[in-house]
């Protein structure tokens, strides 16, 4: 059933339902589901990549470790256009990665959904790694030493001791990554452009609607992003508060 049909019948409906239907009709659902898919994929990738990186940061004794921490934190302070520009160059047809990808698929990574995933992973890296590393560092070293004395492997200790004790940090990192990916704009625009159904996310859609002076549609999409971010952060804070309330006091 089309939006036009709903608008035609809205005079016979209650005002509240009419306004809700109008808001739904103003929403770009193609951009919504593309953004949601991007956020899910980026969060999953950063869970896989972020855990080993965070583990190394938390437990490594290398004297130059701070350089790696600085590299991980760079996306927080760099302007999105700067980061997006260098990611775009790295994914272009003249780069080794771009040539390799083009030899396999026949097209470059730039201005594709796959390229968007890579750019978003880089841009959201600190939002996953830093909470992970902080939660790993907070694990009582006596438990790790006891595990080593008992002959338990580091791999098993990681999954049986560190991960359960760091679960609140993992939830925080995952939620921040998801929320940050949904709201990305600069890197998304630089790396993916504005291709409907391919790289146009909700943030790009808002930009388009504002340029077209379509403030009603821009407001609807902005409210959706605001609601998603608020709900995610509320769930994270509620979860962490419950975890800390159950944590034994010294």
Residue ranges and their predicted role:
Residues 93, 170-207:
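Non-cytoplasmic
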Residues 26-57, 70:
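Transmembrane alpha-helix signature in integral membrane proteins
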Residues 24-30, 191-230, 234:
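Interhelical loop and adjacent transmembrane-helix boundary motif
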Residues 49, 71-80, 107-133, 164-168, ...:
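Faces of alpha-helical transmembrane segments in polytopic inner-membrane proteins
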Residues 64, 133-144, 148-149, 219-250:
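C-terminal transmembrane helix and the adjacent membrane-cytosol boundary/short C-terminal tail
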Residues 44, 129-132, 136, 140, ...:
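Transmembrane alpha-helices
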Residues 22-23, 84-121, 191-195:
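Membrane-interfacial helix termini and adjacent extracytoplasmic/periplasmic loops
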Residues 56-87, 144, 168, 250:
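Cytoplasmic-entry segments and transmembrane alpha-helices of multi-pass inner-membrane transporters
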């Amino acid at each position: 059933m089309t939006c036009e049909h709903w608008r035609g019948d809205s005079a016979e409906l209650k005002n509240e339902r009419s306004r809700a239907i109008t808001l739904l009709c103003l929403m770009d659902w193609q951009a919504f589901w593309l953004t949601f898919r991007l956020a899910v994929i980026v969060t999953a990738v950063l869970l896989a990549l972020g855990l080993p990186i965070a583990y190394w940061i938390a437990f490594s004794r290398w004297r130059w470790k701070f350089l790696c921490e600085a590299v991980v934190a760079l996306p927080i302070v760099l302007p999105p256009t700067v980061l997006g520009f260098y990611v775009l160059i790295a994914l272009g047809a003249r780069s080794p990665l771009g040539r390799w990808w083009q030899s396999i698929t026949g097209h470059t990574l730039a201005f594709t959904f796959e390229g968007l995933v890579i750019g978003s992973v880089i841009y959201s890296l600190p939002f996953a790694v830093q909470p992970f590393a902080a939660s790993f560092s907070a694990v009582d070293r006596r438990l790790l030493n006891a595990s080593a004395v008992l002959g338990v492997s580091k791999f098993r200790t990681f999954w049986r001791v560190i991960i359960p004790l760091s679960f609140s940090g993992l939830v925080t990192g995952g939620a921040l990554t998801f929320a940050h990916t949904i709201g990305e704009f600069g890197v998304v625009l630089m790396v993916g452009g504005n291709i409907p159904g391919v790289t146009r996310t909700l943030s790009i859609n808002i930009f388009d609607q504002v340029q077209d002076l379509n403030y009603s549609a821009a407001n609807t999409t902005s409210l959706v992003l605001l609601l998603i971010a608020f709900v995610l952060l509320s769930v994270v804070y509620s979860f962490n508060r419950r975890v800390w309330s159950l944590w034994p006091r010294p």
